[in-house]
């Protein structure tokens, strides 16, 4: 592909910590090494306010002037819209008005989140999201299960875009615990849509660690004083939490994939999770498949999994392969 200038349009960017940011932070350096120039249109470039339930998520407004200038100054060869917020819709509007082709990606099940918090029917929210993707040449989706879900809501031009994992950073060699106590670890947002309380209330004689921040953090700290809440961790520190865990517990039923599952597996840590979108798409090898509708039973299964099998499973899931797929799906404007 000869194109050199890629415009990424996103409502999710640093300092946010989420799967969207992780994915693109991982692929951008590889794209740049291949000779592509990358520019990102993101919330910090606009006037914005914090999302009511999540202070770290910014809602942009008065987007037209800055969006128009971004496109006119940069003149991208490729446009990819990463999210369905105000910035994403501003990018879509510019592309349509100027007859530019674009691709997009679907990362987050906002309809499920909004239904849990505001009781708005999923069908209504999906209709709004579908509008952004309706003119997209290709809609990149992180899992087969999520692709099938979106088909039910009449999304078109869907393709599966597989994720990678940094197997150098997330590595069993980071394990440095001498503790004889079994350790169950959760990494992610501390929020009701992550179903985290199913993990917190598990009746087990094991140590539980929660890595992450979120709107329910203080409530759960007060409610579960016996659990170790350590806040957000990144880099080497995060890698140690994964590697030192005996089981990584992923209680969410609303994820589109779950990058954290891949990071835990690369660290040699088996997964306890429900048989839902995300986990069922990742844990396809019977040696590491511990899925169960009973989370405690899944934990028990995970404790029997060989750590080396978890690690070996991830060795083929490289970010280079992820970038190759990404470029195959891109289109010239």
Q: What are the residue ranges of the model-derived segments?
A:
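Short hydrophobic beta-strand element within catalytic cores of glycosyltransferases
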Residues: 270-273
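A charged, aromatic-enriched C-terminal amphipathic alpha-helix characteristic of glycosyltransferases
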Residues: 303-332
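Donor nucleotide-sugar binding/catalytic pocket of nucleotide-sugar-dependent glycosyltransferases
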Residues: 127-173
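Conserved donor-binding/catalytic core segment of Leloir-type glycosyltransferases
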Residues: 176-211
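Short alpha-helical donor nucleotide-sugar binding micro-motif in glycosyltransferases
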Residues: 71, 232, 240-245, 326
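Aromatic "clamp/platform" in nucleotide-sugar-dependent glycosyltransferases that forms part
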Residues: 253
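Acidic anion/phosphate-binding donor-loop and adjacent secondary structure
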Residues: 165-182, 219
């Amino acid at each position: 592909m000869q194109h050199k200038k890629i415009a990424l349009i996103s409502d999710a960017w640093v300092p946010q910590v989420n799967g969207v940011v992780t994915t693109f932070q991982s692929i951008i350096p590889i794209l740049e090494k291949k000779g592509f120039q990358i520019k990102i249109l993101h919330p910090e470039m606009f006037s914005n306010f914090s999302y009511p339930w999540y202070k770290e998520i910014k809602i942009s407004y008065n987007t037209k002037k800055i969006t128009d200038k971004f496109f006119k100054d940069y003149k991208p060869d490729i446009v990819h819209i990463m999210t369905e917020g105000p910035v994403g819709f501003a990018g879509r509007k510019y592309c349509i008005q100027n007859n530019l082709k674009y691709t997009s990606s679907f990362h987050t099940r906002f309809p499920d989140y909004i239904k849990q918090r505001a009781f708005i029917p999923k069908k209504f929210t999906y209709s709004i999201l579908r509008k952004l993707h309706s003119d997209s040449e290709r809609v990149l989706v992180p899992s087969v299960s999520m692709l099938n879900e979106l088909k039910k809501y009449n999304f078109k031009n869907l393709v599966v875009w597989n994720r990678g994992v940094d197997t150098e950073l997330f590595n069993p060699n980071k394990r440095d615990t001498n503790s004889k106590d079994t350790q169950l670890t959760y990494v992610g947002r501390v929020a009701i849509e992550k179903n985290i309380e199913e993990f917190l209330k598990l009746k087990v004689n094991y140590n539980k660690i929660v890595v992450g921040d979120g709107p329910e953090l203080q409530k759960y700290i007060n409610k579960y004083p016996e659990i170790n809440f350590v806040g957000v961790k990144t880099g080497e520190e995060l890698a140690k939490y994964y590697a030192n865990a005996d089981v990584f517990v992923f209680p969410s039923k609303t994820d589109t994939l779950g990058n954290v599952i891949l990071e835990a597996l690369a660290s040699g840590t088996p997964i306890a999770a429900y048989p839902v979108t995300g986990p069922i798409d990742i844990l396809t090898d019977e040696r590491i498949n511990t899925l169960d509708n009973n989370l405690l039973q899944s934990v028990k299964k995970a404790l029997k999994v060989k750590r080396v099998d978890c690690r070996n499973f991830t060795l083929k899931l490289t970010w280079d392969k992820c970038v190759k797929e990404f470029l195959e799906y891109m289109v010239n404007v």
